[in-house]
A protein has these predicted regions:
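A short linear hydrophobic-aromatic micro-motif
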Residues: 63, 162-166, 198-204
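PLP-dependent enzyme catalytic core of the Aspartate aminotransferase-like
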Residues: 185, 191-236
Length: 236
């Protein structure tokens, strides 16, 4: 808070961080931005489909989210939410036919259909939502994913020999956990895991500390986690 003064106009933060897999207290952060007269912009790439996203309740100025990650929508689908006071102030870098149309919502008119973009993945989002609801995603599937990742968490932590990133359970997203890597050269870790063990694991080396992230989806099982652990033992 000591770093924020009147010169700060925009505060941006993730709902769930990609590298460290931390679930942020976004309502508190939005209120913090408001109290300092700053615009709040939330990177919600990993949130929709993993945690409840109530845009009215969050009340941020802007929220950008993906549907093709945890919502299981076709690749390349996402959304931009803008509070009503910003709707008619957002201009796309490439204008669409809506630029010359009359109407009150410029956000939709100017961003809705641009060039030759294939909108069929967007039209499939409704089916994704219906699929999640029909399969009781938030009440049954996600809790099972959390149970699976928590069951193996201590074992993975033991393989790394590093401390946990999670001092408070409130910061743990339901289906993601990140782990610190010990000191050393991990530049080949991702490729070796993928090519030699057929394990896809994001490895983040662009920070002072190095991380890898484990994500669990409905199709993962105990066998997958055991194979992951054996691969980590081999390459870390």
């Amino acid at each position: 808070e000591s770093l924020i003064d009147s010169s700060v106009k925009v505060i941006t933060f993730p709902h769930i961080s990609a590298a460290t897999a931390q679930l942020f207290p976004i309502k508190d952060l939005v209120n913090f931005a408001k109290s300092h007269g700053a615009i709040s912009v939330i990177d919600g790439a990993h949130a929709p489909g993993q945690v409840n996203v109530n845009l009215q309740d969050i009340d941020a100025d802007f929220y950008v989210g993906n549907c093709h990650k945890w919502m299981l929508s076709p690749k390349g689908v996402g959304f931009i939410y803008a509070a009503r006071k910003w709707e008619n102030k957002i201009r796309p870098p490439a204008i669409s036919w809506g630029n010359i149309s009359s109407g009150t919502n410029r956000l939709l008119l100017e961003n809705d259909w641009q060039g030759t973009t294939d909108i069929s993945p967007i039209l499939a989002v409704e089916d994704s939502i219906n699929f999640l609801e029909e399969n009781h995603w938030f009440s049954q599937v996600i809790p099972e994913c959390t149970k699976l990742i928590d069951e193996f968490y201590s074992t993975i932590l033991g393989v790394t020999g590093m401390k946990s990133l999670y001092e408070k359970n409130d910061f743990e997203p339901p289906q993601m956990r990140s782990f610190l890597l010990p000191e050393g050269d991990h530049s080949t870790l991702h490729n070796r895991l993928f090519h030699e063990s057929k394990v896809e694991l994001p490895v983040f080396l662009d920070f002072e500390d190095h991380f890898f992230r484990v994500s669990v989806q409905a199709y993962n099982n105990h066998s997958d986690m055991e194979r992951l652990i054996e691969a980590l033992k081999k390459f870390i």
